């Protein structure tokens, strides 16, 4: 029975912050509705005063007095709203701190239970540590074997060069079969070494462009410009006719 009463008391203490927050929020909702009502009353009395300011000054003054009363009540209501909001924030922050502390205590107790009977010396003496060291050594040996230059079949650079020259010769022979002539560059490459070097040293004569090379392009450009001008004139004539 005593444990039941103790549990009920603990539950009541746990629910106390939530109940307080609910009560404060309910009262805050009521004050916010009152704030909206007072603002509407002020706007209504101001409209009455503006309506009677030139025709009935007494009615206008009475409306302004009522507006002042509503304005004072509105200020008090807004101050109460601020106080309630601060109290709600304070209770929520305190409740969050309490829950966080309880969670930290539970985590500490769980870690203490997990580490019960475990020490650094015991971990160092276990076979697990020896197995880890053995596997690490094997991994290092494998890495060294993979990165060793002797790992795998090495490629002979001379064989690659010879194969590449053979492919170039086949391509050149194929071009000769298709064209029936030997290209100038291939003839130079087939000359003996001294003659080939001498021919390579001689520059090719530069090609000269004759003035007639650019005549077709210039005529085409001039014709396009004339067509554009004619189209522009036709457009202007159509606009003037309208």
Curated annotation (Swiss-Prot):
Its record classes its membrane topology as: Peripheral membrane protein
Its BP terms in the Gene Ontology are: ATP export; intralumenal vesicle formation; late endosome to vacuole transport via multivesicular body sorting pathway; peroxisome organization; protein transport to vacuole involved in ubiquitin-dependent protein catabolic process via the multivesicular body sorting pathway; reticulophagy; vesicle budding from membrane
What UniProt keywords are attached to this protein's entry? Coiled coil, Cytoplasm, Endosome, Membrane
Question: Where does the record place a coiled coil?
Answer: 19-95, 152-179, 216-242
The annotated region (Disordered) lies at: 187-242
Residue spans of biased composition, Basic and acidic residues class: 233-242
Q: Which InterPro entries match?
A: Snf7_fam
Pfam families annotated for this entry? Snf7
Q: Where in the cell is it found?
A: Cytoplasm; Endosome membrane
> Which cellular components does GO assign to this protein?
cytoplasmic side of plasma membrane; cytosol; ESCRT III complex; multivesicular body
Which molecular function term from Gene Ontology is one that the record holds?
Answer: identical protein binding
| Intrachain disulfide bonds | none
Principal localization?
cytoplasm
Summary of the function given for this chain in its UniProt record: Required for the sorting and concentration of proteins resulting in the entry of these proteins into the invaginating vesicles of the multivesicular body (MVB).
Q: How does it assemble?
A: A component of the endosomal sorting required for transport complex III (ESCRT-III). Interacts with palA.
Q: Which family does the UniProt entry place this protein in?
A: Belongs to the SNF7 family.
> What is this protein's name?
Vacuolar-sorting protein snf7
Native species of this protein?
Emericella nidulans (strain FGSC A4 / ATCC 38163 / CBS 112.46 / NRRL 194 / M139)
């Amino acid at each position: 029975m005593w444990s039941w009463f103790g549990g009920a008391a603990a539950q009541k203490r746990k629910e106390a912050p939530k109940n307080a927050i609910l009560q404060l929020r309910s009262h805050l909702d009521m004050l916010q509705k009152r704030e909206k009502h007072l603002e509407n009353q002020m706007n209504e009395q101001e409209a009455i005063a503006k309506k009677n300011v030139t025709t009935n000054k007494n009615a206008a003054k009475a409306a302004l007095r009522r507006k002042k009363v509503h304005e004072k009540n509105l200020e008090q209501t807004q101050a109460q709203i601020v106080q309630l909001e601060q109290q709600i924030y304070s209770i929520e922050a305190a409740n969050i701190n309490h829950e966080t502390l309880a969670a930290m205590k539970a985590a500490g107790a769980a870690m203490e239970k997990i580490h019960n009977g475990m020490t650094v010396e015991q971990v160092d003496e276990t076979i697990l540590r020896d197995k880890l060291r053995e596997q690490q050594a094997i991994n290092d040996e494998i890495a060294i074997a993979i990165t060793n230059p002797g790992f795998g079949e090495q490629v002979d650079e001379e064989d690659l060069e010879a194969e590449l020259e053979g492919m170039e010769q086949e391509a050149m022979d194929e071009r000769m079969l298709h064209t029936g002539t030997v290209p100038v560059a291939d003839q130079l490459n087939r000359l003996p070494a001294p003659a080939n070097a001498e021919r390579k040293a001689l520059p090719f004569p530069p090609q000269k462009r004759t003035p007639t090379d650019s005549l077709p392009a210039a005529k085409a450009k001039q014709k396009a410009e004339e067509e554009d001008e004619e189209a522009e004139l036709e457009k202007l004539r159509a606009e003037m006719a309208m």
